[in-house]
A protein has these predicted regions:
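Residue-level signal for well-ordered alpha-helical segments
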Residues: 3-13, 36, 112, 119, ...
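Active-site-proximal loop/turn and secondary-structure-junction residues that shape catalytic pockets
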Residues: 9, 33-35, 72-75, 110-114, ...
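Conserved glycine-rich "GG(E/T)P / GGGxP" loop and the immediately following alpha-helix
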Residues: 78-84, 118-120, 153
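Glycine/proline-rich, positively charged
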Residues: 115-131
């Protein structure tokens, strides 16, 4: 078992993320948002090349390896109506950086649904499948997080997404079901049951 955490949940700056990870005795980190000294805060796959090079060196010097990228690909800040070029650009920037750091996994999502939506549009399936294939073709494994996204609307929606995007795997956030409605049920939607969700998707979690 490898223990790690998402860096920016310990602090915005790279140095504080490294400090927290080392204090826990962990050897791995999942970088997401990051402020490298001298550069504005951005996602690890979006920071300038010079900032990325500096971050990689600092992580290596600290004895930390990058196990997974906490990306912004199709996350809850994006909608399926946004130009797909935004997503494709993020994927194309992430791939060489994953290879540089030796990371095999990348956390992705499936766009934020509208407040009253309870079905996943075909375009979401198409985009997630395309993104999944882009990573798999490079020997990298995308993992979908259950969050405020179409695939996270219920465990049934998650399994439907996996069926439509062969090769996609999951990362399970135990806290997210607590504040997300179960859109597989009639309105008014109850909150999701984290244990029930886990029981149905656990075989697909890496």
């Amino acid at each position: 078992m490898k223990l790690m955490g998402i860096g920016d949940e310990a602090g915005g700056g790279l140095d504080s993320q490294i400090t927290a990870t080392r204090e826990l005795g962990w050897k791995h980190i999942e970088p997401r948002g990051m402020e490298v000294p001298g550069f504005a805060k951005a996602n690890f796959h979006e920071i300038p090349d010079a900032a990325f090079d500096l971050a990689v060196k600092k992580l290596e010097d600290a004895g930390l390896s990058v196990y997974c990228f906490g990306s912004t690909v199709m996350n809850w800040a994006k909608k399926v109506g946004d130009p797909f070029d935004i997503t494709l650009g993020e994927v194309k920037r992430a791939i060489p950086r994953m290879k540089r750091t030796g990371a095999k996994y990348i956390r992705i999502m499936s766009f934020k649904p509208g407040d009253d939506e309870f079905q996943t549009p075909p375009e979401v399936f198409r985009r997630v499948k395309d993104v999944t294939n882009m990573f798999l073709d490079q020997g990298l494994q995308p993992v979908h997080e259950n969050c405020m996204n179409y695939g996270g609307m219920s465990w049934q929606h998650t399994l439907e997404l996996l069926d439509k995007a062969p090769g996609l795997k999951l990362v399970f956030d135990t806290a997210n079901p607590i504040f997300n409605p179960d859109r597989s049920r009639p309105k008014p939607w109850p909150r999701q049951d984290a244990w029930e969700f886990w029981e149905h998707v656990r075989d697909h979690v890496v």
